[in-house]
Amino acid sequence: MAPGSTMWLLGYIFLCFPVSFALIKQPKPETPTDPGVLHCRPWNFKFTINFQNQETGSSPVLVTWDNQGRLHRLQNDTDCGTRVGEGPGPSVVLEANYSSCYVTESEPYYVMLVGVEEVDAAGQNLVTKQQLLKCPMHLPAPDAGLCDSVPVQDRLPCATAPISQEDCEELGCCHSSEEVNACYYGNTVTSHCTQEGHFSIAVSRNVSSPPLHLDSVHLVFGNDSECQPVVATRAFVLFLFPFTACGTTRQITGDRAIYENELLATREVRTWSRGSITRDSIFRLRVSCSYSISSSALPVDMHVLTLPPPLPETQPGPLTVVLQIAKDKDYHSYYTMDDYPVVKLLRDPIYVDVSILYRTDPYLGLRLHQCWATPRTNPLYQPQWPILVKGCPYTGDNYQTQLIPVQEAFDLPFPSHHQRFSISTFSFLDSSVAKEALKGPIYLHCSVSVCQPTGTQSCTVTCPIDSRRRNSDINFQNSTANISSKGPMILLQATEDPSEKLHKHSGVPVHPGALWVAGLSGIFIIGALLVSYVAIRTRR
């Protein structure tokens, strides 16, 4: 089966039984005309902005919001990991650690909302401007292995000495205080945008396996002399070229100008009458620099977009999918065969997990198509009740199914192998006029498919689905194989009938013989009282 296509390997499984900011009550802040310059460091934001108020002469203040929507003035705060200081000229520099009180993790970015508070003509403090700072959570900065693996004789200087370790690492380079070349390139691709409007791209031969032939690395659209590497050694090749040359494209988006170019390594191909081979890696690299048009020429950010790794080879084979019921909403444990039948009251939640077993391929995805319930093991048995329709909660239920996002965790390394949802327990009604509740088990059925690669359109479902396509009927696809598992059942405990409830609270049941004894005793007592009364009257 070809990669990228949906693999309809499994059919039916049967089992018995943001960054959000609070609204501030003040005029809506504007986006500043000068958005400032943001540097995404390996450990923090570095944000430089020129915001001197020329009209009032007052000194505006940088502010931010916590996750409760409360406003805070930014200052030097060790506990919250923020530092505010003067920059060049009339600018202010903010540094905020990614672990700061005001930084939120919004995969795959660290984000922080920053505002400018000024005094208006009436003397009121107002937040007049705001800027959302966003840095990737995983910067392409070299780790220790990429740095230590570069032999001393192969180290290519990344910056001229002297340079601090902080400034060196900000360039994405390695630092060693023991070597002459204290700041050098690691065994990776290191790219940055210069203030003068140039791309700087260093490529290590060990960025791929097998190693690259560096003499084959070139700019896709650049053949001029200025597009050739400025430095070429046996271990590295360095390109330095302006945005106005070498086929660089320019695109204006809002207040930003985005420049892009592409590097490519030519593969050596051997051909004979019966075929062709190559022993070279595929290397294609797209880089982009983003600049603010209205501010200075400092780059706003830099992106290196490499090709995704090739999809794994696929071949036919067994694949196991299981449907389990969790004991709690956190999915810490599941009911086993020995735990059934599981008794549930009406409206009790049932937490369902459908997962692929015994696979470690991160590109596999699991997709739920239809899920429904029947009072028998037969999935075609009537009556039926839809739970998921085309992967989305059935909208005709007043207790709608809740889709539960699956996050990567230590005990859940492949979240794409799982689909989770919760339902509220219910009881089927018979077809009579009285609509009596059917006591007994409820059986849950799902149709699923395993798809590849995860994250593509064939592997994802967007809810709510188009109303024109919404249909509660259960449709079986001819290309889907059907399998069933006769599992244990979930018994639904019926609600008490009012007459049963009255009987339940009327006291301990009385034997009929005891009622006769009590009656005769009462007659004798009444008779004795009458005789005593007559005797007393006679004496008088």
UniProtKB/Swiss-Prot annotation:
Entry-linked InterPro entries: P_trefoil_CS, P_trefoil_dom, P_trefoil_dom_sf, Zona_Pellucida_Domain_gp, ZP-C, ZP-C_dom, ZP-N, ZP1/4_Ig-like
Biological role: Component of the zona pellucida, an extracellular matrix surrounding oocytes which mediates sperm binding, induction of the acrosome reaction and prevents post-fertilization polyspermy. The zona pellucida is composed of 3 to 4 glycoproteins, ZP1, ZP2, ZP3, and ZP4. ZP4 may act as a sperm receptor.
Glycosylation sites: 76, 97, 206, 223, 296, 306, 478, 482
Cellular component aspect of the GO annotation: egg coat; extracellular region; plasma membrane
Entry comment on modification after translation: Proteolytically cleaved before the transmembrane segment to yield the secreted ectodomain incorporated in the zona pellucida.
Keyword Lipoprotein recorded: no
Pfam families the UniProt entry points to: Trefoil, Zona_pellucida, ZP-N, ZP1_ZP4_Ig-like
Compartmental location: Cell membrane
Entry protein name: Zona pellucida sperm-binding protein 4
Domain ZP residues, every copy: 192-470
Topological domains, Extracellular: 25-515
Record comment regarding domains: The ZP domain is involved in the polymerization of the ZP proteins to form the zona pellucida.
Residue stretches spanning the membrane: 516-536
Annotated gene: ZP4
Main localization of the protein described in the UniProt heading: membrane
Membrane-topology descriptor: Single-pass type I membrane protein
KW Ubl conjugation (keyword) present: no
